[in-house]
């Protein structure tokens, strides 16, 4: 987990809930117990094959994931208590928090965070690097621009045909 600051602990718990990672470590300049600094991130391959940025800022998260994907596999992390439709597309570097719901036919683009208890209704397009904070509702057939950030409990309806 790279460049995580406070959000990293939450992301670690999400990754642990998936039960598929043997070891989860941090690379960060400000985290006690990190395995290394940000400038050393390239040196941990092949011991670590997966890496994901967990920055609070969507643009920074996207930038880090683009850099990481040159060396590492970038996972999608989704909490075991989230619900993702089989027809939804979740792209690399996304983080789906507990009890989030992603509806059929929706696309969640790269490095987007879907917050706890958020709902992305069917047939939505959520752009790269978005941050949907807890309780956000994205109404059916909406399209969100790259880098959209919501506040808790926001309800959005931005029809695809108006984008």
Label every PLM stretch briefly.
Residues 1-80:
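Terminal amphipathic alpha-helical/low-complexity segments used for targeting or macromolecular assembly
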Residues 77-163:
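Structural signal for interior beta-strand "rungs" in well-ordered beta-sheet cores
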